[in-house]
Design a protein with these regions (language model features):
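Acidic, low-complexity proline/glycine-rich segments
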Residues: 1-12
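Alpha-helical scaffold segments that form or flank carboxylate-/histidine-based iron centers
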Residues: 18-32, 54-80
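Aromatic-residue-lined binding/catalytic grooves and analogous aromatic/hydrophobic interfacial grooves
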Residues: 38, 42
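Surface-exposed patches in mature extracellular/periplasmic domains of secreted proteins
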Residues: 47-55
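Extracellular zinc-dependent metalloprotease catalytic-domain scaffold
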Residues: 72, 97-100
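Membrane-interface helix-loop-helix modules in multi-pass inner-membrane proteins
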Residues: 75, 88-93
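Conserved small/polar residues in nucleotide/adenosyl-binding loops
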Residues: 109-111
Length: 111
């Protein structure tokens, strides 16, 4: 399944009051995140991963531990990370979602 760059859920200047300028968001979303999308799509083209979901690509390429697939894993996982990043930040958001907080605490207990 092709990677698709999601629209930001807010305007590029929406985080200026928190110190993230419109220019920073434009660069980070429109160029940096988009590079993971473009490169990921190039890497999965014509492979077994082309028809898989993003989550299946991440899990499958991580589990495979294949050197040739490291680029696929990196681009897929960074695309996923950035999608979460955009959703978790935004005007009016200040607290960590309770599900994420619980998962983080649980994961730290097992370290």
């Amino acid at each position: 399944m092709a990677f698709i760059l999601p629209d930001l859920p807010y305007a590029h200047d929406a985080l200026a009051e928190f110190g993230m300028s419109a220019e920073t968001l434009e660069y980070h979303h429109d160029l940096h995140h988009n590079a993971y999308v473009v490169n990921g799509n190039k890497l999965i083209a014509g492979t077994e991963w082309e028809s898989k979901s993003l989550e299946d690509i991440i899990i499958g390429t991580y589990d495979a531990k294949a050197v040739a697939q490291n680029g696929i894993f990196n681009n897929a996982s960074q695309h996923w990370n950035h999608m979460q990043f955009w959703e978790m930040m935004g005007p009016g958001k200040s607290a960590m979602p309770s599900e994420l907080e619980a998962a983080l605490i649980l994961s730290l207990i097992h370290i």
